[in-house]
Amino acid sequence: MTDLNKVINELGELGIYDVKEIVHNPSYEQLFEEETKPGLAGFEKGVVTTSGAVAVDTGIFTGRSPKDKYIVLDEKTKNTVWWTSDAAKNDNKPMNQETWQSLKGLVTKQLSGKRLFVIDAFCGANPDTRLAVRIVTEVAWQAHFVKNMFIRPSDEELQNFKPDFTVMNGSKVTNPNWKEQGLNSENFVAFNITEGVQLIGGTWYGGEMKKGMFSMMNYFLPLKGIASMHCSANVGKDGDVAIFFGLSGTGKTTLSTDPKRQLIGDDEHGWDDDGVFNYEGGCYAKTIKLSAESEPDIYRAIRRDALLENVVVREDGSVDFDDGSKTENTRVSYPIYHIDNIVKPVSKAGHATKVIFLTADAFGVLPPVSKLTPEQTKYYFLSGFTAKLAGTERGITEPTPTFSACFGAAFLSLHPTQYAEVLVKRMKDSGAEAYLVNTGWNGTGKRISIKDTRGIIDAILDGSIESAEMGSLPIFDLAIPKALPGVDPAILDPRDTYADKAQWQAKAEDLASRFVKNFEKYATNEEGKALIAAGPKA
């Protein structure tokens, strides 16, 4: 048993006093009872669905709130963090100590005198580099979410648990003084790296806790020479490891959940001297338009102990996965063992030999697959391109390009080139090959079928792409296969999907100019300038 007096004292050191009761690392059974209790109202209330999973709503925040993210500026962080600037805007906005103390006071006051859920867990499967994380919340389903998403400690590990980082979730409290403090709004997601504390106020979105700790791993690990990656990963029966980078909605979770391969994890990984390891103990899958036919493994994972967010639940308790009226970003979190085919007992494997960059190109320009040179690998990793099409966010009706460094700029705490350097070094050491895979659209106006994309991934993983005859795509100078087993050959060169190739040419020139403009921010040093040649020619 954990010594609860010790936990109470540690909370007191943070400023949380007069705790009525601590519910420490409750079982799933207890969490189910707690989050579906009669009398719960508003966003605290969980609804049991016919699958057995509980569904909750997160209110107006159905995604992260990057405009409300801050990091305390101090001696430790001033020269290490990739701070936002007018020249290159990002989400790492500096916060002074005075404002931090004020926000910390708001959250600790909110959590004081309450019955609290305290979850002690790990972020990172390797004992040497993992963060021991303590999450403190007054909301049962938030405790359920982090129990799903972080690595659950053994009883023995709990005995000697000493938190490196504490997440204090005060979703019920907002900041009345935000204007005077020069902040974006009354909501806040703030980090003090020196203190080892994350504060959340005003937003109920569960992903703030998950991605908050990812941002912290992205701070600590690359400084130790360990690659820290926004990617999914799996391993074949011969021990061959593949990693899949990509922004939200490009197919990381879907494509890495493969019946022929064991899943290491679906979103956050490190790569050290021993190989690739998961940061998490669960998966956080998008559920919009989910079906048993298209994604059987994820569909089956939605059962008791899974937690659905912002889905539409019908009168009879069934879920309408096609209904995006609350948000397109409907989600489910579940413990990783809800997927049958996973690496056990620890989510880690050897060095990666295949590195796949997923992009969903709504312009219809990029090929469904191309093999990258080492220079192109760095270029496309730093570019982190994808594009949204109508309907993914309010008010967007045409292709909108997103360039997100390292396929995860929102979570980078250090400068993007630091992640690129560490990744390319790891790839060099393991002899890994890199590929750019477009899961988006082509000249037909339709999205490339998941069947063709899976065929492409199979060809990469089984090595058959290596023996394919290759052609070259102009403007982008990308190497593209002329034929692959199980893939419609008519789609491999995107120009062939247009009735008139001049249409492709015009779109390609437009997209190339956007790549070039985006990359200007990296051309401030010799190394960045040297990579320009690896990109498209506008």
UniProtKB/Swiss-Prot annotation:
Keywords: ATP-binding, Cytoplasm, Decarboxylase, Gluconeogenesis, Lyase, Manganese, Metal-binding, Nucleotide-binding
Catalytic class of the enzyme: lyase
Family the UniProt entry places it in: Belongs to the phosphoenolpyruvate carboxykinase (ATP) family.
Entry annotated with the keyword Transmembrane: no
Role according to the record: Involved in the gluconeogenesis. Catalyzes the conversion of oxaloacetate (OAA) to phosphoenolpyruvate (PEP) through direct phosphoryl transfer between the nucleoside triphosphate and OAA.
Binding site for ATP: 211, 230, 246-254, 295, 331, 447-448, 453
Lineage start: Bacteria, Pseudomonadati, Pseudomonadota, Gammaproteobacteria, Pasteurellales
Compartment(s): Cytoplasm
Pathway(s) this gene product operates in, as recorded in its UniProt entry: Carbohydrate biosynthesis; gluconeogenesis
Name listed for the protein in its UniProt record: Phosphoenolpyruvate carboxykinase (ATP)
Coiled coil residues, start to end: none
Cofactor binding description: Binds 1 Mn(2+) ion per subunit.
GO process terms (BP): gluconeogenesis
Cofactor list: Mn(2+)
Catalytic activity: oxaloacetate + ATP = phosphoenolpyruvate + ADP + CO2
Entry EC no(s): 4.1.1.49
Annotated binding of substrate, by residue: R64, Y205, K211, R331
